[in-house]
């Protein structure tokens, strides 16, 4: 006998069922299928062909209608309605379940305590429930009803009254208590509505509807079903946690990148994982020259939420990386949705901003470090009252030179020495991106890219015609040792990482600089020249109140400038402490060309004046440094040739070298600051005692520089030496 195979899908189960109907495929009807299936309360859909839409699911309810057949088979889908048999096994005709009758009205009982009337998931034992007299058959029917509700929540809500389950506002079984029905139901509805909504949380509804059972086996079944539902609940929790992490940021932005202008996206991504799964994709670093770097809105640490129309919220890290790689390889614009996150405790993926205050400022360490780098001494009390300075730099600017970075005091140019440029570039406020870099799995601390150096020089140093000249300047920095390659390459490349060299070497570099020496051979008599420092015994402020401040020993310097090796030939011993230099022996900016006024001051103060030809020194003659300074300042004539200025035999015979105490009255000094600046510090003698006389014959004096030839960027260095030597800015020590 011919038969027809009917394949039917029951509800949402993955595995279909097969039934053989003893009717030919050309004559099979719905009643034949129902007779073989034995299920009455269901909707039947069959695979059919429509002219407009193609293959569709057609619902057939007429028992005499023929069923559509494909390849001698019928494909059907069954949607169970309320009150049908559970779908855990193939149905049988004998197990058809009738609709449940409503539960009987229980007898009235006394009102329970108020604290038990409004709890969610009532925790009272089964003996407290009103339907304690219910039979096991009624419990089985309740079990079937709960399973049916699990299958189809929408139909369960629509037909809850038809199924015979009396449900409250939030899915709880109503207690039909005649004594306090209205008040108890109202209280339960209000409280449960504000706490749990059955439309949103199916787990709480099932838990509430199963509180009326008293069978141990029923409780065990409920416990097992609840364990089965835990994975979806944890999934919702994980999703909510992920959304919370992303929305906890300041804002979420959408960036559209035009990939036609750039060859690559230019980001590295970092995946975050924990025991609960993957925690999202974050921006690890941004590469120069990419589309993201050109846009500028995305920063390291931002969380990547979506690329184009693909959401990364519930996607694993591996899938997100694969999707992102596929999107980048496709042409067209890329839309990135990122959350601007900030992790207060980064795990090393990201770097803190350079201007972020991390540690409290220690003023003592700051001053000590600044003095070690710049070679300047700490400002001692009384410097603010030194208003007799007549140079172009005021006292306030001197103080600013210690408190502000050099970049705010002067502008850099191509004529600025390399040491000053590097010091400005190395300051934290310079704008150069200096951070830890990774190269071949090696961490390079405080490194910067060669292209960043060229860009910084091109934008901050004046005088470059094009970027190529800035690159040559950077190459000179590498050759001079101010920046170093990680493997000591001597050729500069913009694609390599560099670090700053030993910044203390800037002092060595500055001692060897030249500022267009003027030896006086040109015969120009009207040029302003810079005198060397005065010898000990000079007190440039005769009326300045004395103070008992003792210099602190600065950092020992191992650098000995070659231009000052002759200084050891002069003696700095005890002498007549009463002699003082006059104001005329100082080469100030306001009276350096006024020789007559300088002679009048020399006459009043009793200091040797050479212009008149006689000596008025009351406490011994001055040394040749002071004498040559007076010759240039007071005489007003042409400077002699270098041979005359470099030998002591040209001095008048009645000016033998004498020694003086460097300390001014009331100022005890335990060492000689000038000697300390020029050579490594010797052992400190007792207070008031200077090093003994040296037997080395005097050599050539330091070269005299033009004041106008000193670039403005050396102002801070000049002021530092003024404060160190205890002299105003009229004297400038040439350590170039």
From Swiss-Prot:
Residues 100-114 have a biased composition (Pro residues). Keywords: Cell membrane, Cell projection, Cilium, Cilium biogenesis/degradation, Cytoplasm, Cytoplasmic vesicle, Developmental protein, Gastrulation, Membrane, Nucleus, Phosphoprotein, Wnt signaling pathway. CDD domains: DEP_dishevelled (cd04438), PDZ_Dishevelled-like (cd06717). It is found in: Cytoplasm; Cytoplasmic vesicle; Cell projection, Cilium; Nucleus. Gene3D superfamilies: 2.30.42.10, 2.40.240.130, Winged helix-like DNA-binding domain superfamily/Winged helix DNA-binding domain (1.10.10.10). Residues 1-82 form the DIX domain. GO terms for biological process: activation of GTPase activity; anterior/posterior axis specification; canonical Wnt signaling pathway; ciliary basal body organization; cilium assembly; convergent extension; convergent extension involved in gastrulation; dorsal/ventral axis specification. Phosphorylated. Phosphorylation is controlled by frizzled proteins, correlates with the onset of embryo dorsalizing events and is higher in the dorsal half of early cleavage embryos. Phosphorylated on tyrosine residues in response to association with efnb1/ephrin-B1. Residues 181-195, 574-593, 616-629 have a biased composition (Low complexity). Residues 149-160 have a biased composition (Basic and acidic residues). Residues 254-326 form the PDZ domain. It comes from the Eukaryota. The keyword Nuclease does not apply. InterPro entries: DEP_dom, Dishevelled_C-dom, Dishevelled_fam, Dishevelled_protein_dom, DIX, DIX_dom_sf, Dsh/Dvl-rel, DVL2. The keyword Phosphoprotein applies. Expressed equally in both animal-vegetal and dorsal-ventral directions of the early blastula. Becomes enriched on the dorsal side of the embryo after cortical rotation. Expressed along the anterior margin of eye field of neurulae (stage 16 embryos) and in the anterolateral crescent that borders the eye field. Continues to be expressed in the optic cup at stage 26. Expressed in the central nervous system throughout the early tailbud stage including the entire hindbrain. Residues 219-231 have a biased composition (Basic residues). GO terms for cellular component: cell cortex; cell surface; ciliary rootlet; cytoplasm; cytoplasmic vesicle; cytosol; nucleus; plasma membrane. GO terms for molecular function: ephrin receptor binding; frizzled binding; identical protein binding; syndecan binding. Residues 327-427 are annotated as: Interaction with custos. It is a peripheral membrane protein. Belongs to the DSH family. Can form homomultimers. Interacts with prickle1. Interacts (via PDZ domain) with ccdc88c/dal and dact1-B/dpr. Interacts (via DIX domain) with ARP/Axin-related protein and dact1-A/frodo. Interacts with sdc4, possibly via fz7. Interacts directly (via DEP domain) with efnb1/ephrin-B1 and indirectly with the phosphorylated ephrin receptors ephb1 and ephb2, via association with SH domain-containing adapters. May interact with lrrc6. Interacts with custos (via NLS1 and NLS2); the interaction is negatively regulated by Wnt stimulation. The C-terminal region containing the DEP domain is required for membrane accumulation and phosphorylation. Wnt signaling and axis induction requires the DIX domain. The C-terminus contributes to the localization at the cilia base. Involved in at least 2 independent signaling cascades, controlling cell fate via canonical Wnt signaling and cell polarity via a planar cell polarity (PCP) cascade. Acts synergistically with dal/dapple-like to activate Wnt signaling, stabilizing ctnnb1/beta-catenin and leading to dorsal axis formation. Also prevents degradation of ctnnb1/beta-catenin by displacing gsk3 from a complex with ARP/Axin-related protein. This is Segment polarity protein dishevelled homolog DVL-2. It comes from Xenopus laevis (African clawed frog). The lineage of its organism: Eukaryota, Metazoa, Chordata, Craniata, Vertebrata.
